[in-house]
Amino acid sequence: MVCQALLHESSKCVPCSHKFCKACILRFKDCPLCGADIEGIEPDDELQALVDRFIDGHARIKRSHVAGTEEVTGDKNKVIYEDVSMERGAFLVRQAMRAFRAHNIESAKSRLSMCAEDIREELKSSQDNQELCSQLGAVLGMLGDCCRTLGDATSAITYYEESAEFLSKLPQNDLELVHTLSVSLNKIGDLRYYDGDLHSARSYYARSLDVRRTAVIEHSAVASQVIDVATSLAKVADVDRNLGNESVAVEGFEEAIKCLEKLKLGSEEASLEQRRLSVLDFLRKQLDDK
């Protein structure tokens, strides 16, 4: 699969000379465009420089600006900042998501890093801007996903923790923010769990559960929030069981089951009902196995 995002590490197929991202073309033995055998791959620095200039001029949130015949020297460039919620920051994120879906992770990471850098710069002059903090939290979470996919658990945890730090500063009345924050906390918990640090994993799972419990109090009619709470209860209970706290674990599983059994969904919510039944089946098996 070719990512169809802006070229990253532009590379040329030999002998046909068709050009792709390095990570994309390395998967092929034949050119995806013409079908010719690929005898070698060469970097195309000139094309990559053109792509980089396009990104700097049209895709970055910040850019240098010279008015009229104003002379610019050293670091005295006047920098204009666009609204990060507008197309410039969103463009970089879209490019990153295209690359990520096609497993061109280094490309995705590069674009997200640019976006994070620009938002950080914007925050220097607008530290209390909640929208910027929310956007940075989301971008950092995606950077964590990139590092996790690349097998760099340490960097992934660092990004997830920073994401959670920014998102935790914001009012928890936006469901999208609640979801992003709770997922980042759970992902840290997962990585700690896989590393064998169960106490740390439980701490992060419990924080995620607290965020979701608070949200469901204000949004009790939102079915997905109830399912999220049950999922978090299951994560905490699973760690409790592995720590030898069986009675506490059973209480957690039972509470999660009650949450889902009380949840009634309409016929138009088929996907949520499937998710509810899947989680419920898992929870019941945990009690059957005790």
Model features per residue range: what roles?
Residues 1-15, 19-49:
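RING-type zinc-finger domain of E3 ubiquitin ligases
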Residues 87, 94, 135, 142, ...:
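"A position-specific structural signal for the A-helix of alpha-solenoid helical repeats
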Residues 77-83, 119-133, 166-178, 213-225, ...:
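Flexible helix-coil transition and linker loops at the boundaries of alpha-helical arrays
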Residues 90, 131, 138, 158, ...:
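Residue register of alpha-helical TPR repeats
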Residues 79-121, 145-149:
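Alpha-helical segment of the N-proximal tetratricopeptide repeat
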